[in-house]
Curated annotation (Swiss-Prot):
NCBIfam families, sorted: cobA_cysG_Cterm, PRK06136.1
Protein name: Uroporphyrinogen-III C-methyltransferase
Family: Belongs to the precorrin methyltransferase family.
EC code: 2.1.1.107
Keywords attached to this entry: Cobalamin biosynthesis, Methyltransferase, Porphyrin biosynthesis, S-adenosyl-L-methionine, Transferase
Enzyme class: transferase
Catalyzed reactions: uroporphyrinogen III + 2 S-adenosyl-L-methionine = precorrin-2 + 2 S-adenosyl-L-homocysteine + H(+)
GO molecular-function terms, A-Z: uroporphyrin-III C-methyltransferase activity
Annotated S-S bridges: none
Keyword Transferase: yes
This protein's pathway: Cofactor biosynthesis; adenosylcobalamin biosynthesis; precorrin-2 from uroporphyrinogen III: step 1/1; Porphyrin-containing compound metabolism; siroheme biosynthesis; precorrin-2 from uroporphyrinogen III: step 1/1
Natural source organism: Synechococcus elongatus (strain ATCC 33912 / PCC 7942 / FACHB-805)
Binding site for S-adenosyl-L-homocysteine: 12, 88-90, 118-119, 166, 195
Gene from which the chain derives: cobA
Role played: It is a step in the biosynthesis of both cobalamin (vitamin B12) and siroheme.
Length: 243
């Protein structure tokens, strides 16, 4: 019997943001290996007899080592089972998919990758922030701030719109480095917490004040948007698709 592993993007939160392909795949899963940020309602889509394995993967919190996750995928696949590796957002956007695919490839396991709606792009929309605009922003860049010392802050400071992930513990560094390299201290900033979940919250501040305003709050998981497009939120912040 031949097994197969599916790396599936769960989107930003609500099960309604799953693709049809992802929903169909989950409904026939035999093993579900999922990250910490997956909405519990998505877990209800798998069969009752599906083995569910939580592997964490949340910044700063306890999680299963990547090598162990790779081993789980290979072992269950070699047992002839349909394995779903469920990741928040899109598997290929800061999803560490390369390590898992490499392990499957080296072990001769069959696999497929199903795209998901990236939280980096969905979060601003759900907060009422267009990340491009004919006047205010002709483009954007998405970066992770997991290792702030590795970033080229001089280059980032010149970009019209910045979308930052894993930055909740580095607000002081983000503000300091961007201002030091020429960004206006008054640049508007929005922080979208738990994007796409029922408890979604949006905070607004400026580059020079955000660390002081938000520093004492538990902010993870969040997406940070920096740029003049944040000012457009006042026109569309009320908009949420409700079916």
């Amino acid at each position: 019997m031949t097994g197969k592993v599916y790396l599936v993007g769960a989107g930003p939160g609500d099960p309604e943001y799953l693709t049809l392909q992802a929903q169909q795949c989950l409904q026939s899963a035999e093993v579900l290996i999922y990250d910490a940020l997956i909405d519990p309602r998505i877990l209800d889509l798998v069969p009752a007899n599906c083995d569910r394995i939580a592997v964490g993967k949340r910044g700063g919190a306890e999680s299963t080592p990547q090598a162990t996750i790779n081993q789980l995928l290979v072992e269950h696949c070699q047992q002839g089972r349909k394995v779903i590796r469920l990741k928040s957002g899109d598997p290929f956007v800061f999803g560490r998919a390369a390590s898992e695919l490499d392990a499957l490839e080296r072990s001769g396991c069959d696999y497929a990758v199903l795209p998901g709606l990236s939280t980096a792009l969905a979060a601003p929309l759900l907060a009422g922030i267009p990340i491009t605009d004919p006047v205010l922003s002709r483009g954007f860049a998405v970066y992770t701030v997991h290792e702030p010392d590795a970033l080229n802050w001089e280059a980032l400071a010149q970009l019209e719109t910045l979308i930052l992930l894993m930055g909740s513990r580095h607000l002081l560094t983000i503000g300091h480095e961007l201002i030091r390299h020429g960004r206006s201290p008054d640049s508007p900033v929005a922080l979208i917490q738990w994007a796409g979940h029922p408890q979604q919250t949006v905070l607004e501040s400026s580059l020079s004040r955000m660390a002081q305003q938000w520093g004492d709050q538990p902010l993870s998981p969040c997406v940070i948007v920096i740029g003049e497009v944040v000012r457009l939120r006042k026109y569309w912040a009320h908009y949420r698709y409700d079916g």
